[in-house]
From Swiss-Prot:
Superkingdom: Eukaryota
Expression sites (tissue/organ): Expressed by the venom gland.
Keyword Secreted annotated: yes
Protein name per the record: Toxin To40
GO function term, MF aspect, one: toxin activity
Broad class of the protein's primary localization: secreted
Localization of this protein: Secreted
Gene Ontology CC terms: extracellular region
Lineage: Eukaryota, Metazoa, Ecdysozoa, Arthropoda, Chelicerata
Keywords: Secreted, Toxin
């Protein structure tokens, strides 16, 4: 998570 999404690694 970096953008606010649960799978945005």
């Amino acid at each position: 998570i970096k953008n606010g999404y649960p799978r945005d690694s």
